[in-house]
């Protein structure tokens, strides 16, 4: 579990996070949602220690991130898995080598054991057949699954995902959502997902935190989203749904244009 208590953060006198209080629950998919520029990314960066808040506490199962020394912070980061907006795979490495990378960096196991662990993670995301391929030889969805395999290679307690469905079609996005959720439950991790995708919210949003202009406006479950009378949240949902429909039309138009040519 991760607890955020009274977090504030300002840049050049402008408040970006304003007294944020939130609990990210263990074994659940915790989603931070909001418009671009709302403070979601800054909040994530503070939580993982890439930024330091001006005030407040960030507790990892009771351990205070802000008071940690460099060695303690490095040890904590080894308990974190990261899934970035792009796949962030190394082009010069095979899929298997990409998944082995964090193991080669931080694990003291033998090469044989590290390779076995990487192969297990690839099997878990249904990519065993692609382990000897390079990123340029696989699809965007497969690259995302490879990135998930790499993120769980060190058996993390905490998983952080930044817009994991960015650039994916709706069907593939659904598969990635389900995979992240299932792995969260299996590993009993605390998973924090930064997204503005309402499909993800309604699919796997077990604990949802809505941020607007640096303020936590609302927190609840996907079931409570439907019945919420929070105007800011409802406006965000409407805008997100409209943007999704426009994107679907553009994708359909693009497919039709390609067929015509």
Residue map of PLM features:
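Conserved ABC ATPase signature
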Residues: 134-138, 142
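Helix-to-loop junction immediately C-terminal to a conserved catalytic motif
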Residues: 48
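Catalytic Walker B motif of ABC-type/P-loop ATPase nucleotide-binding domains
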Residues: 159-162
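C-terminal boundary and immediately downstream tail of ABC-type ATPase nucleotide-binding domains
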Residues: 223-261
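Conserved ABC transporter NBD signature motif
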Residues: 56-64
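A short, proline-enriched helix->beta-strand linker immediately N-terminal to the Walker B motif
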Residues: 153-157
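Helix N-cap at the start of a conserved alpha-helix in ABC-type nucleotide-binding domains
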Residues: 170-172
């Amino acid at each position: 579990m991760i607890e955020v208590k009274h977090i504030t953060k300002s840049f050049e006198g402008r408040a970006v996070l304003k007294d944020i209080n939130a609990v990210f629950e263990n074994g659940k998919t915790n989603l931070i949602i909001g418009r671009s520029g709302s403070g979601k990314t800054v909040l994530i960066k503070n939580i993982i220690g890439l930024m330091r808040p001006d005030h407040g506490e960030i507790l990892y199962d009771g351990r205070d991130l802000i008071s940690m020394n460099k060695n303690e912070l490095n040890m904590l980061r080894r308990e974190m898995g990261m899934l970035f907006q792009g796949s962030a795979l190394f082009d010069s490495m095979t899929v298997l080598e990409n998944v082995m990378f964090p193991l080669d960096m931080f694990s003291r196991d033998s090469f044989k054991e590290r390779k076995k662990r990487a192969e297990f993670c690839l099997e878990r995301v249904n990519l065993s057949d692609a382990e000897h391929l390079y990123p340029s030889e696989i699809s965007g969805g497969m690259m995302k699954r490879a990135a998930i395999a790499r993120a769980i290679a060190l058996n993390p307690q905490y998983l952080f995902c930044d817009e994991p469905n960015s650039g994916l079609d709706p069907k593939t996005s659904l598969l990635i959502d389900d995979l992240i959720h299932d792995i969260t439950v299996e590993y009993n991790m605390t998973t924090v997902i930064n997204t503005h995708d309402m499909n993800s919210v309604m699919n796997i949003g077990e604990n949802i935190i809505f941020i607007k202009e640096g303020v936590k406006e609302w927190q609840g479950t996907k079931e409570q989203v439907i019945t919420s009378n929070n105007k800011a949240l409802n406006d965000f949902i409407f805008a997100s749904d409209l943007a999704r429909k426009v994107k679907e039309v553009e994708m359909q138009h693009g497919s039709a244009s390609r067929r015509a040519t």
